């Protein structure tokens, strides 16, 4: 018999609106002894069936909903989800010429805690919830059925798994170990991805649209690409005709890959048209400001500053300081392209932070364009938390 949870009276409202999370305070009774990640039936306080969910006894999000239908959570279930997700993305895959894209965006694709990125024929999984871990083999088997020649690699080396009572883990789940370099293509740009050792699942696929949109601001411009990682924005800047691009990052291996990517695309990087600078971005910006060095375009795509609500105030200060410094080194008429991937910081708050940075920088700034995550990272209407990446193009007078 399937274990069950009964909600506190009134707590069923969000479930009826199809939100996939049930918090611990919303559960009135647990029937049976569900194991970590096991599928349970969800009922109202008076016994009306609502959903199928994965139970996680150690997490504040006590249950994550798999389905609002009375169906088994098995290989066939995941096959259907993968087929729907692939179909949803077919247009953008063809439009942008993608050989690397997000196949599954967790809750937004109806699979809580499951993220799957595709790089050529390597499918990289992050399984961040107890339910995802419990159903790992079914997920792998479903991928193999949908994509028979696939290789499946796990990159569940993410600290959030501890909140679910899980250990961090990586490794081959099916097929071959990824090589050091898997080359993908997007919008005609070739990018080398290190699946095993790179950030996230290997690359920041969510910024693809922003990289493309950045091209219209860079022709014949001096560009500073901050937190450049393996050079994504810098590659598009070179493609867009930038006069010079400085890629700044604290990781020398990432910069080495950025240079390799520029060579892979046969961009002209002679005469210092492209520079790969190993530097702490905060210190570098202060040095440029103090030296009076200025740029036409500054691209600011920092790592996530806030992992929890407790870190949000500190993150706000960090975002304000770094954007203030960026504004101070822009030429009159210059452009700041700035982004935040912190889900806890919404677009309104981020816009206020940029406005505060403009005041502190003593610069007059206009918002001229807004950005969000790429089209293969959809946001379900019932799950606004799926909208996490936001950005602005700002003109400095």
From Swiss-Prot:
GO CC list: cytoplasm
* Catalytic reaction list: cytidine(1962) in 23S rRNA + S-adenosyl-L-methionine = 5-methylcytidine(1962) in 23S rRNA + S-adenosyl-L-homocysteine + H(+)
User: What EC number(s) does its UniProt record assign?
Assistant: 2.1.1.191
Give the keywords, sorted. Cytoplasm, Methyltransferase, RNA-binding, rRNA processing, S-adenosyl-L-methionine, Transferase
> Which Pfam families does the record match to this protein?
Methyltrans_SAM, PUA_3
Q: Which SMART domains match?
A: PUA (SM00359)
Its subcellular locations are: Cytoplasm
What GO molecular function annotations does the UniProt record carry, in alphabetical order? RNA binding; rRNA (cytosine) methyltransferase activity
Q: Which residues form the PUA domain?
A: 2-79
- Where primarily located? cytoplasm
Family the entry assigns:
Belongs to the methyltransferase superfamily. RlmI family.
- This protein's name: Ribosomal RNA large subunit methyltransferase I
* Organism field: Vibrio parahaemolyticus serotype O3:K6 (strain RIMD 2210633)
Q: Which gene name does the record give?
A: rlmI
């Amino acid at each position: 018999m399937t274990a069950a949870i009964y909600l506190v009276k009134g707590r069923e409202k969000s479930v009826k609106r199809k939100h996939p999370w049930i918090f611990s305070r919303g559960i009135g009774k647990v029937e049976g002894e569900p194991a970590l990640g096991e599928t349970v039936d969800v009922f109202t306080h008076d016994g009306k069936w609502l959903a199928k969910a994965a139970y996680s006894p150690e997490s504040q999000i006590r249950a994550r909903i798999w389905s609002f239908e009375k169906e088994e959570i098995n290989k066939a279930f995941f096959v259907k989800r993968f087929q729907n997700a692939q179909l949803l993305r077919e247009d953008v895959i063809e439009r942008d010429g993608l050989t690397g894209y997000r196949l599954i965006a967790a809750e937004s694709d109806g699979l809580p805690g499951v993220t799957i990125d595709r790089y050529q024929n390597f499918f990289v999984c992050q399984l961040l919830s107890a339910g995802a871990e419990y159903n790992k083999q079914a997920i792998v088997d479903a991928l193999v059925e949908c994509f028979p020649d696939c290789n499946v690699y796990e990159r569940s080396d993410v600290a959030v798994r501890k909140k679910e009572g899980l250990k961090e883990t990586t490794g081959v789940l099916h097929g071959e170990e990824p090589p050091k370099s898997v080359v993908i293509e997007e919008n005609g740009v070739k990018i080398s991805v290190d699946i095993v050792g790179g950030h996230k699942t290997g690359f920041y696929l969510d910024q693809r649209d922003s990289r493309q949109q950045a091209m219209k601001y860079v022709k014949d411009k001096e560009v500073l690409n901050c937190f450049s990682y393996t050079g994504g924005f810098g590659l598009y800047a070179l493609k867009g005709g930038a006069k010079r691009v400085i890629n700044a990052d604290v990781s020398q291996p990432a910069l080495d890959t950025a240079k390799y990517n520029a060579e892979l695309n046969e961009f002209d990087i002679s005469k210092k048209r492209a520079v790969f600078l190993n530097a702490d971005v905060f210190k570098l910006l202060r040095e440029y400001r103090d030296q009076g060095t200025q740029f036409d375009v500054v691209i600011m795509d920092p790592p996530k500053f806030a992992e929890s609500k407790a870190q949000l105030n500190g993150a706000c200060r960090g975002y304000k300081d770094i954007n203030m410094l960026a504004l101070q080194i822009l030429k009159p008429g210059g452009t700041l392209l700035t982004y935040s991937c912190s889900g806890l910081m919404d677009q309104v708050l981020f816009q206020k932070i940029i406005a505060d940075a403009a005041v502190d920088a003593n610069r007059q700034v206009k918002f001229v364009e807004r950005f969000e995550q790429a089209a293969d990272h959809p946001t379900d209407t019932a799950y606004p938390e799926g909208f996490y990446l936001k950005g602005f193009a700002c003109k400095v007078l």
